[in-house]
């Protein structure tokens, strides 16, 4: 695009200088459109292309990373910008940017890479230089032979002259090409580059070769002495490795195994000096005799001779110039040779293995370096995929990039007449509106400046709403309705199109949604493609790489598991307590209940304190729950055992009773009912006196298996005593038992004769307490239900507290008892008479949930007032 268009002298150059000075709009008053079109056609531009190029280049200054090229359309006498601005608008440039600056930098970088970092075809040049240096060395060796001295000298002179020109030109190119690096720019940077060791070597070899070539093959003393400098060509072999890769590799191997090498060299040196000293002591006074019997000079005359012998021997060279003569010396030499040779040869093995490992590591590193480009491409594609998300309206930089590279034309109404617009399709209209769009470089969109190309010079120009830079930024932010409306207006030739705002200046706000969707699809495909390429580069290089990957994965898994465990502990563990240490509640040994104390009596008993604090971790809480479940099991076992013992004692008291059978008349049946009521009061009196003398009266249960279908007891109590001291006393219990289930005091059916206090007197009426008498009298309208619990039913109960019986034939009286007794046979733990139909609670709660100290006024019939 670097074409400059000649414009009339009166035309302002602000539009062409938009890249450096901010870019103003072209002045339409500077010349007519025809003259401008002629001038543009002279330089090979279509009408309007000058403004396109100028606008595109002016807007390019705002894009980060674009080249700042000089725009066209500048007048010869136009005043230049006093000072250019750099790429980041921070560093002012002292001179304008050259047109061939990019090409100059590209050639400079290419030469620097070929000389300093040879790859590909550059290796051929370095191979040629190596052959030249090797030929000079061979010819220098041949000059030492008398028969080849003359011929080899002539060829050596020609080859050295050629080598001087080659090396001189190469050195100059190296100094010049070093400017592509920022640290070697300027003359100071060039001096810094020339002070490098290899550059100093090149300078030294060039200086030494010039006088050798100058004197030629002269036979004087000066020429002969200068010819010795030819062997400095050997130093040129060092320049083959400009980057010092071999030396770096050797140094890294030595540094990696420095401890092993120092150990081997240290022990080998000790073996050398000790063996040499002992051999010197033994062999120093032994004279050497030749074949004629004459004494010769001693071989181990000094300690230095012994050190020489020891070094040659332990290094396994063995010149044989010095050997021990005595058997003592030979024995010492053999012993120390076996020890010292192994330590002298050990560094060679260490260096060999170290170099092999380093070479393998370099190959692996090269394999890993191949992942850099796919990784960078994947990161770039991932960001562009994220930035083109339609939901992220705040990310506009990526869309602006596409605005600068995707060309999307506008429509000019002067290019489309009404007849043509009706015949041409949309694609033809697009091509017609931008005839030279395909020839522009860089795919920069250049919106047309209609003001500069008017049909009539006398037509009044319209004011431009925004400058060129703003128009370029929003060039492709056009809505679909604006696009179709503008094309419609341009095709139909509507004179009101300009009034609507779609003639010269489009109200462009956003890109077409279809174009955005296409760009989004391309971003997704590129992201998946780069992701696939990056996964292909992640293939393991060798078995060691596989092991390292598995090890890294295992460590990562362990770290994640540890992190999860820490998070779980943080979730289930409360924060640090604020209570001081000396006031914290401590936990001691597990609390055990006394053998004669019910655990339900005092469930919350303070535990003794110790110096330990409770474990608040998740495992500690599991242990705590398990301990509590174990304690609950022990309590249930205790309750079941106590209840079974209680049932056994009740069975002992009623074992002797046997009810009469075969009632023949209603009178006899009524008499048996009265007798059954008397038996009930007798049992209540007997049980109330079996406990401790000071214990309060309480009602307990009688097993129902002793009750028959035709009487209260399975057998008639023919031998039941109604008086005397033995009738009120039974076997004393070892301790005061407390039943675990609340006793149910339900009276017999209304057929009984408990309707008045007069009928209350029976065989044991004198043994019933006043409270019991009032309770029996008050509840005389309901049958008495004595619960029957055996061991089988306790095992069938899930908790031991809900006790039931499933014998339907247990009934009271000849008629089988009441229906309420068959439905409600048990009272569960925590259940009160509120849950039963005939009773409602009234009064204060009992003193103990076990039945001790039950008030007689608690239970009142639900149908009677108290």
Curated annotation (Swiss-Prot):
Keywords: Cell membrane, Ion channel, Ion transport, Membrane, Phosphoprotein, Potassium, Potassium channel, Potassium transport, Transmembrane, Transmembrane helix, Transport, Ubl conjugation, Voltage-gated channel. GO terms for biological process: action potential initiation; apoptosome assembly; cellular response to calcium ion; cellular response to xenobiotic stimulus; endocytosis; excitatory chemical synaptic transmission; exocytosis; gene expression. Residues 1-42, 574-617, 656-676, 757-866 are annotated as: Disordered. Residues 1-120, 176-193, 245-256, 354-866 are cytoplasmic. Residues 356-537 are annotated as: Mediates interaction with calmodulin. Signal peptide: none annotated. It is found in: Cell membrane. Residues 144-153, 214-225, 283-302, 316-326 are extracellular. The chain crosses the membrane at residues 121-143, 154-175, 194-213, 226-244, 257-282, 327-353. InterPro entries: Ankyrin-G_BS, Ion_trans_dom, K_chnl_volt-dep_KCNQ, K_chnl_volt-dep_KCNQ3, K_chnl_volt-dep_KCNQ_C. Coiled coil: none annotated. Residues 837-866 have a biased composition (Polar residues). It catalyses: K(+)(in) = K(+)(out); Rb(+)(in) = Rb(+)(out); Cs(+)(in) = Cs(+)(out); Na(+)(in) = Na(+)(out). A motif (Selectivity filter) lies at residues 316-321. Residues 303-315 dip into the membrane without crossing it. Phosphatidylinositol-4,5-bisphosphate (PIP2) potentiates the activation of KCNQ channels by enhancing the electro-mechanical coupling of the voltage-sensing domain (VSD) and the pore-forming domain (PD). In the closed state of the channel, PIP2 is anchored at the S2-S3 loop; upon channel activation, PIP2 interacts with the S4-S5 linker and is involved in channel gating. Calcium suppresses KCNQ2-KCNQ3 channel currents, with calcium-bound calmodulin inducing a change in channel configuration which leads to the reduction of channel affinity for PIP2 and subsequent current suppression. Each subunit contains six transmembrane segments (S1-S6) with S1-S4 forming one voltage sensing domain (VSD) and S5-S6 contributing to form one quarter of an interlocking pore-forming domain (PD). The S4-S5 linker preferentially interacts with PIP2 in the open-state KCNQ2 channel, whereas the S2-S3 loop interacts with PIP2 in the closed state. This is Potassium voltage-gated channel subfamily KQT member 3. It comes from Bos taurus (Bovine). The lineage of its organism: Eukaryota, Metazoa, Chordata, Craniata, Vertebrata. The gene is KCNQ3.
């Amino acid at each position: 695009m670097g074409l400059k268009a000649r414009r009339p002298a009166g035309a302002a150059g602000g539009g062409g200088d938009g890249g450096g000075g901010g870019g103003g709009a072209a002045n339409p008053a500077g010349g007519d459109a025809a003259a401008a079109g002629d001038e543009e056609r002279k330089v090979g531009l279509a009408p309007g292309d000058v403004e396109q190029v100028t606008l595109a280049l002016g807007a390019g200054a705002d894009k980060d990373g674009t080249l700042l090229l000089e725009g066209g359309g500048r007048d010869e006498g136009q005043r230049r910008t006093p000072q250019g601005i750099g790429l980041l608008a921070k560093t002012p440039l002292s001179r304008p940017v050259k047109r061939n600056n990019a090409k100059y930098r590209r050639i400079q970088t290419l030469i620097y890479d070929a000389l300093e970092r040879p790859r590909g075809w550059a290796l051929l040049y370095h191979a040629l230089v190596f052959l030249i240096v090797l030929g000079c060395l061979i010819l220098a060796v041949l000059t030492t032979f008398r028969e080849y001295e003359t011929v080899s000298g002539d060829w050596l002179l020609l080859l050295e002259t050629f080598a001087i020109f080659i090396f001189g030109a190469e050195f100059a190119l190296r100094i010049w090409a070093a400017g592509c690096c920022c640290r070697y720019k300027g003359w100071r940077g060039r001096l810094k580059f020339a002070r490098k060791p290899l550059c100093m070597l090149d300078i030294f070899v060039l200086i030494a070769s010039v006088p050798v070539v100058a004197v030629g093959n002269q036979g004087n003393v000066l020429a002969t002495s200068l010819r010795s400098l030819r062997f400095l060509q050997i130093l040129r072999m060092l320049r083959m490795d400009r980057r010092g890769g071999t030396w770096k590799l050797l140094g890294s191997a030595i540094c990696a195994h420095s401890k092993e090498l120092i150990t081997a060299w240290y022990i080998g040196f000790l073996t050398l000096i000790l063996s040499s000293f002992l051999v010197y002591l033994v062999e120093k006074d032994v004279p050497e005799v030749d074949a004629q019997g004459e004494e010769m000079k001693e071989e181990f005359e000094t300690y230095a001779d012994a050190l020489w012998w020891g070094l040659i021997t332990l290094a396994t060279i063995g010149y044989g110039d010095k050997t021990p003569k005595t058997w003592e010396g030979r024995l010492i030499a053999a012993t120390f040779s076996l020890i010292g040779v192994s330590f002298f040869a050990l560094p060679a093995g260490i260096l060999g293995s170290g170099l092999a490992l380093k070479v393998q590591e370099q190959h692996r590193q090269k394999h890993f370096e191949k992942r850099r480009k796919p990784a960078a491409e994947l990161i770039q594609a991932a960001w562009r995929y994220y930035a083109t998300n339609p939901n992220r309206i705040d990310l506009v930089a990526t869309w602006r990039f596409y605005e600068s590279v995707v060309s999307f034309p506008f429509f000019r109404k002067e290019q489309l007449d009404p007849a043509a617009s009706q015949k041409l399709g949309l694609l033809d209209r697009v091509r017609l509106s931008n005839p030279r769009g395909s020839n522009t470089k860089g795919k920069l969109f250049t919106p047309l400046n209609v003001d500069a190309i008017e049909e009539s010079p006398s037509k009044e120009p319209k004011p431009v709403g925004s400058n060129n830079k703003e128009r370029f930024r929003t060039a492709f932010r056009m809505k679909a309705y604006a696009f179709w409306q503008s094309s419609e207006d341009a095709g139909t030739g509507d004179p009101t199109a300009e009034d609507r705002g779609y003639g010269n200046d489009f109200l462009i706000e956003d890109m077409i949604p279809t174009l955005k969707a296409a760009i989004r699809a391309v971003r997704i495909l590129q992201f998946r493609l780069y992701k696939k390429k990056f996964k292909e580069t992640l293939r393991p290089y060798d078995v060691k790489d596989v092991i390292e990957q598995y090890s890294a994965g295992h460590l990562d898994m362990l770290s994640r598991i540890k992190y999860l465990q820490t998070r779980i502990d943080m979730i289930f563990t409360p924060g640090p307590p604020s209570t001081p240490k000396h006031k914290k509640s401590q936990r001691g040994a597990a609390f055990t209940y006394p053998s004669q104390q019910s655990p339900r009596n005092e469930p919350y008993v303070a535990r003794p304190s110790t110096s330990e604090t409770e474990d608040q971790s998740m495992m500690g809480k599991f242990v705590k729950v398990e301990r509590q479940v174990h304690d609950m099991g022990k309590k249930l076992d205790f309750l079941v055992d106590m209840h079974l013992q209680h049932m056994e004692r009740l069975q002992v008291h009623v074992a002797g009773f046997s009810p009469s059978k075969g009632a023949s008349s209603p009178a006899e049946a009524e008499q048996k009912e009265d007798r059954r009521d008397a038996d009930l009061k007798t049992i209540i009196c007997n049980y109330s006196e079996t406990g401790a003398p000071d214990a309060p009266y309480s009602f307990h249960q009688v097993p129902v298996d002793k009750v028959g279908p035709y009487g209260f007891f399975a057998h008639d109590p023919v031998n039941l005593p109604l008086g005397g001291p033995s009738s009120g006393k039974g076997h004393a219990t070892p301790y005061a038992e407390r039943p675990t289930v609340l006793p149910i005091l339900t009276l017999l059916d209304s057929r009984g004769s408990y309707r008045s206090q007069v009928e209350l007197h029976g065989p044991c009426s004198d043994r019933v307490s006043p409270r019991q008498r009032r309770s029996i009298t008050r509840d005389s309208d309901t049958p008495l239900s004595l619960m029957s619990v055996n061991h089988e039913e306790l095992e069938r109960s899930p908790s031991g507290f809900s006790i039931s019986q499933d014998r339907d034939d247990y009934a009271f009286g000849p008629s089988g008892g009441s229906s309420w007794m068959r439905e409600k046979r048990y009272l569960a733990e925590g259940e009160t008479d509120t849950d039963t139909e005939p009773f409602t609670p009234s009064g204060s709660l009992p003193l103990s949930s076990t039945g001790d100290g039950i008030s007689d006024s608690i239970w009142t019939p639900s149908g009677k007032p108290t």
